[in-house]
Curated annotation (Swiss-Prot):
Gene3D superfamilies assigned to the protein according to its UniProt record, in alphabetical order: 1.10.20.140, P-loop containing nucleotide triphosphate hydrolases
Family the UniProt entry places it in: Belongs to the IPP transferase family.
Gene: miaA
Disulfide bonds: none
Organism: Mycobacterium sp. (strain KMS)
Keywords carried by this UniProt record: ATP-binding, Magnesium, Nucleotide-binding, Transferase, tRNA processing
Site feature Interaction with substrate tRNA, where: S103, R124
Name of this chain's protein: tRNA dimethylallyltransferase
The EC number(s) this enzyme carries: 2.5.1.75
Length: 305
């Protein structure tokens, strides 16, 4: 069975659409969902990632959820390998794999079988040390001198990606973008659905989502994860919501002041997601508010299948 991918910005309703599609197909064929949200890989990071509780998954098997401890570093290469194995096993069982998420590099690495450039622990460690010495803003400036395009595409607060870009530039002698995947026929002939809303409507949804996260106990979740090493986690501690709560707690606050910067950071991230996904001509875009999205999604999938 060829897969279906449902991608797009945060807060657009991708998980709900995937479950609706799964229910519609359930009478005729099995369906299993493969997560493509990097932060939902982490055990215990539930509220801040809007991870669906098991009771709300409608009996549909889910993969690539809760596979990492918060002290482990998330890796696109690891995800690509493990998720591809999941997809091929699901298809071999005669079921439909539905890939769901909005983590840009994770989605594209999976669908385009991205071959990753070499890595060198010594070079990586040297740039990590440089980051610790000069700070993320200064290191972003250094990246801008050697690879302006990479600096323009990476947030000046994203130390992990800045370090990786500098590592790749040093090891390959080429711009970071030279290692990016080309956009050709998607792996496994996957049908790709993009879900989005008009900007002002999505902003309202994001505000409500952020309020709900704090009301449901995001601060308490962060406090609990601190006992499991969240602060030492290279990627987990930088996740939206979690990083902002940590910063407020470190400043002596009770975490509640993190609500606004979390919302602002999420809106900024949505702009990056749109810019990334909209350049992909293979995506069939749907309006999140349309009542016939299940039918349109299935038509697109059947046209491929």
């Amino acid at each position: 069975m060829r897969p279906l991918a449902i991608i797009g910005p945060t807060g657009t309703g991708k998980s709900a659409l995937a479950l609706d599609v799964a229910e519609r197909l359930g009478g005729e064929i099995g369906v299993e969902i493969v997560n493509a949200d990097a932060m939902q890989l982490y055990r215990g990071m539930d509220i801040g990632t809007a991870k669906l509780p098991a009771a709300q998954r409608r009996g549909v098997p889910h993969h690539q959820l809760d596979v990492l401890d918060v002290t482990e570093t998330a890796s696109v290469a690891r995800y690509q390998s493990e998720a591809a194995r999941d997809i091929e096993a699901i298809a071999a069982r005669g079921a439909v794999p539905i890939i769901v998420g909005g983590s840009m590099m994770y989605v594209q690495a999976l669908l385009d079988d991205w071959a990753f450039p070499a890595t060198d622990p010594a070079v990586r460690a040297r740039w990590e040390q440089r980051l610790a010495e000069v700070g993320v803003a200064a290191l972003h400036g250094e990246l801008g001198k050697v690879d302006p395009d990479a600096a323009a595409s990476i947030l000046p607060t994203d130390g992990r990606r800045i370090v990786r870009a500098l590592e790749v530039v040093e090891l390959t002698g080429q711009p970071f973008a030279a290692s990016a995947p080309t956009i050709g026929a998607p792996r496994w002939d996957t049908a790709i659905i993009g879900l989005d809303w008009e900007t002002t409507v999505l902003d309202e949804r994001l505000a409500a989502r952020t309020d709900s996260m704090f009301a449901e106990g995001l601060v308490a979740e962060v406090a609990g994860l601190l006992r499991h090493g969240l602060r030492e986690g290279v990627t987990a501690s930088r996740a939206l919501g979690y990083a902002q709560v940590l910063a407020d707690l470190d400043a002596g606050g009770d975490g509640s002041a993190a609500r606004e910067p979390t919302f602002v950071g999420t809106r900024r991230y949505v702009r990056r997601q749109r810019s990334w996904f909209r350049r992909d001509h293979r995506v069939c875009w749907l309006d999140g508010g349309s009542p016939d999205n299940v039918d349109r999604t299935l038509r697109a999938w059947r046209a491929v299948s």
